[in-house]
Amino acid sequence: MAGGPPNTKAEMEMSLAEELNHGRQGENQEHLVIAEMMELGSRSRGASQKKQKLEQKAAGSASAKRVWNMTATRPKKMGSQLPKPRMLRESGHGDAHLQEYAGNFQGIRFHYDRNPGTDAVAQTSLEEFNVLEMEVMRRQLYAVNRRLRALEEQGATWRHRETLIIAVLVSASIANLWLWMNQ
């Protein structure tokens, strides 16, 4: 789990904070939204203490020597395929077994881990990360929609002002023409 989604979540929070700091200084609402999202993330981390304890137990036991290989040693030319997590097998460990595939790939063996706790912790932290990411995207979409609505209202206001100015100029021109013709 070291180097997994919590690091990505922290990076995302930092990039959002930096983005807001480089943006307009008058956008206090966005600062509040980001602060609220960071607080929500810390609360979700605090609420998952039970999951963290499971993770610490897994790290302290003999099965902790197995690590997730999230960045597999594959060349980057493979395209947009996501790396598949693999478990390293500890020699002489009783809960990992080998299963032979009887087909075209005779002799190839697949390693499986029978420790569901590790998978459950990884799955729940990914779900928390996805929920947090969706919440951030929803807030950003709301902010973009609010800005767009404000710009549309501003454009409508300018059109009304332009129409009013043109009407005043046309009336003044007609009045000047009438006065000129009467002299």
From Swiss-Prot:
Involved in the regulation of endoplasmic reticulum (ER)-mitochondria coupling. Negatively regulates the ER-mitochondria distance and Ca(2+) transfer from ER to mitochondria possibly implicating it in the regulation of apoptosis. May collaborate with RNF183 to restrain BIK protein levels thus regulating apoptotic signaling. It is a single-pass membrane protein. This is Fetal and adult testis-expressed transcript protein. Residues 42-66 are annotated as: Disordered. It holds the Pfam family Miff. Keywords: Apoptosis, Endoplasmic reticulum, Membrane, Mitochondrion, Mitochondrion outer membrane, Transmembrane, Transmembrane helix. The gene is FATE1. Coiled coil: none annotated. The keyword Ubl conjugation does not apply. The lineage of its organism: Eukaryota, Metazoa, Chordata, Craniata, Vertebrata. It comes from Homo sapiens (Human). The chain crosses the membrane at residues 163-181. GO terms for cellular component: endoplasmic reticulum; endoplasmic reticulum membrane; mitochondria-associated endoplasmic reticulum membrane contact site; mitochondrial outer membrane. Testis-specific in fetus (aged from 6 to 11 weeks). In adult, expressed predominantly in testis, with some expression in lung, heart, kidney, adrenal gland and whole brain. Highly expressed in certain types of cancer tissues such as hepatocellular carcinoma, colon and gastric cancer. Weakly expressed in normal pancreas. It is found in: Mitochondrion; Mitochondrion outer membrane; Endoplasmic reticulum membrane. InterPro entries: FATE1, Mff-like_dom.
